[in-house]
Regions:
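Membrane-interface segments at the starts/ends of alpha-helical transmembrane spans
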Residues: 36-46, 125-137, 244-258
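Hydrophobic alpha-helical transmembrane segments
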Residues: 9-16, 45, 49, 83-91, ...
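Interfacial transmembrane-helix boundary/kink motif in multi-pass membrane proteins
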Residues: 2-20, 69-106, 110, 250-261, ...
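C-terminal membrane module of polytopic membrane proteins
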Residues: 223-305
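Function-critical hydrophobic alpha-helical transmembrane segments in multi-pass membrane proteins
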Residues: 119-190
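Alpha-helical transmembrane segments in multi-pass membrane proteins
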Residues: 20-67
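Hydrophobic core of alpha-helical transmembrane segments in multi-pass integral membrane proteins
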Residues: 17-24, 53-61, 90-99, 257-279
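Functionally important transmembrane alpha-helices
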Residues: 23-28, 182, 194-251
Length: 305
């Protein structure tokens, strides 16, 4: 009983420590840039790559130390069919969130409080809400675009699906661990609207990680989701590219249709991943049972002799 309690406390503290490192590194970089004279609103790309790079470094060191007692981030080999399924799930998830946001926009016409939350969300996700694009160097815009679908997904997945979910799996059924990390992931995003779809994404990515036992699968989903959700539109909106507004609108509309189209295949892919997971668990249970029966038979034979 005492060992169980200590294990629970240890896992919770490890998860909280990792979360604390995340915020500590973010604020440390923000402070350092301010001291050096960089406006984080203007140099958002520099801030993102610096903060997430530092976070990733400290979380990696944290993992290397913590895994010495017991591994908790898994990199099980996945089949090509599983990888294709994960890509489909990522695109379908982007479609679900698009519907979520369209629904929120529609309801905001009738709910003033929701309209305020929606305006706040739009301002938060708009790269140039505080500083006009003309005042932002092109190199910083490019760094920001690249970081949002590479380093950001890697770092956040390492924290939430890797460390937090990994620690929770030690002390509770994996299904509950998926829910806990998803709630923390949702709350971390702060805004009311953002919390809602971040919670959905956290559950889906947690379940896919559970199905595949391969950390790179939720990273892949997160990366594709971020690219379709923000990076691609930020590329189109770069004034240096000079893409006409009507062409941008047509491309954006086509992308929305593609997301919707992939929702049904994504659902089938998700069911397939679940089926593979369920079958593997049944096979493992059968092998364990056969091994135990073989040991029991050998013991009986030895006693009879």
């Amino acid at each position: 009983m005492k060992k169980t309690v200590l294990r629970v406390i240890s896992s919770c503290l490890m998860a909280l420590l990792a979360l604390g490192l995340f915020y500590l590194c973010s604020y440390a970089v923000l402070y350092l840039l301010a001291v050096l004279g960089f406006d984080s609103d203007r140099y958002t790309g520099l801030y993102c790559v610096s903060s997430y790079g530092l976070i990733m470094l400290f979380l990696w060191i944290f993992w290397r130390i913590a895994r010495q007692s017991e591994e908790f981030i898994y990199f099980k080999k996945t089949s090509p069919s599983q990888k294709v399924s994960v890509v489909l799930v990522a695109i379908g998830l982007a479609g679900i969130v698009t519907i979520y946001m369209f629904g929120a926009a529609y309801l905001s016409k009738y709910l003033e409080s929701l309209k305020e939350h929606l305006d706040e969300y739009k301002q938060t996700v708009d790269r140039y809400s505080d500083v006009p694009q003309e005042q932002v160097p092109l190199w910083d815009s490019m760094i920001y675009i690249l970081t949002t679908f590479t380093l950001v997904p890697l770092c956040e997945e390492f924290l939430f699906r890797g460390i937090i979910m990994g620690q929770m799996r030690k002390i509770m059924p994996v299904g509950f661990a998926v829910l806990v990390q998803a709630v923390v992931f949702g709350l971390m995003h702060g805004l009311t609207l953002h919390i809602g779809y971040a919670l959905i994404c956290g559950i889906v990515m947690g379940l896919v990680y559970m199905f595949c036992d391969n950390f790179w699968m939720p990273v892949l989903i997160h990366s594709i989701f971020n690219f379709l959700g923000s990076s691609f539109s930020n590329i189109l909106n770069l004034k240096q590219l000079g893409v006409p507004s009507d062409i941008r609108a047509n491309i954006s509309y086509t992308l929305v249709l593609v997301k919707y189209f992939f929702m049904f295949p994504a659902a089938l892919a998700f069911v397939y991943l679940w089926y593979r997971y369920k079958k593997n668990k049944e096979d493992e249970a059968r092998l364990i049972k056969e091994a135990m029966e073989a040991v029991a038979a050998e013991s009986e034979e030895a006693l009879s002799c």
